[in-house]
């Protein structure tokens, strides 16, 4: 948390290298994301990102929005498996019978990839009570509905961490509660999350650790009890006096 322009969103975007850090490193599950040898796209598959403005694909219905990434990744993996098998078959042409390498069977198909992605999408939509909206387009939905679908879209990739960039800042006040309730559910289930937020009450209730940023630096960090109950940094004290 912190005032506008303090670097919160930039910090968040550096975590999955949507922004290149000017100094230092970002490690995710032992991998240095700033190392050019690391395939950042593979690492990003395990990071869900939810933006302020939803960033849904307006030319796709809700179901397509949710299944797009899982189907795309599934098809990439299927093509890689087919290419690997083709290489084995080709090399086997030049080997004697006793030295031919067995060709492993494909574990999936395009039809299966699409069906599994759609089943998972419908399960997630049912969880948030929006299964009836599967075939509608984002432009027909409320802000709260669009943001919940954006969260579900990220969850469809089974991420190991979720990054939220002010997920309620573009919502009408009465829509905020339904989005925060979903995020709280994820917290209760043990999902690792990094959330940029101005919802102080929510941060106090849900967070296990709070960072206060100002001027592009972390000025103070600690448990919610420490940050909200006994702040030490003068800038943090001033900030809390204005927002609480």
Description of each model-found segment:
Residues 1-224:
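ABC family nucleotide-binding domain
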Residues 221, 225-244:
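C-terminal boundary and immediately downstream tail of ABC-type ATPase nucleotide-binding domains
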């Amino acid at each position: 948390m912190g005032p506008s322009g303090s670097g919160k969103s930039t910090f968040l975007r550096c975590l999955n290298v949507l922004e290149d850090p000017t100094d230092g490193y970002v490690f995710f599950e032992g991998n240095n994301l700033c190392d050019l040898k690391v395939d950042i796209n593979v690492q990003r598959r395990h990071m869900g990102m939810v933006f302020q403005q939803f960033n849904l694909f307006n030319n796709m219905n809700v179901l397509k929005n949710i299944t797009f990434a899982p189907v795309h990744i599934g098809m990439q993996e299927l093509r890689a498996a087919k290419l690997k098998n083709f290489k084995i078959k080709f090399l086997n042409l030049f080997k004697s019978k006793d030295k031919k390498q067995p060709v492993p069977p494909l574990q999936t198909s395009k039809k299966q990839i699409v069906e599994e992605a759609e089943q998972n999408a419908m399960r997630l939509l049912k969880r948030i009570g929006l299964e009836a909206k599967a075939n509608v387009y984002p432009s027909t939905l409320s802000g709260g509905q669009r943001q919940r679908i954006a969260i579900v879209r990220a969850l469809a990739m089974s991420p190991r961490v979720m990054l939220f960039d002010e997920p309620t800042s573009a919502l009408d006040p009465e829509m905020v509660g339904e989005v925060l309730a979903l995020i709280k559910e994820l917290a209760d289930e043990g999902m690792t999350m990094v959330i940029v937020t101005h919802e102080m009450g929510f941060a106090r209730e849900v967070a296990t650790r709070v960072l206060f940023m100002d001027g592009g630096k972390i000025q103070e960090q600690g448990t919610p009890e420490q940050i909200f109950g006994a702040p030490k940094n003068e800038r943090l004290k001033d900030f809390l006096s204005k927002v609480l």
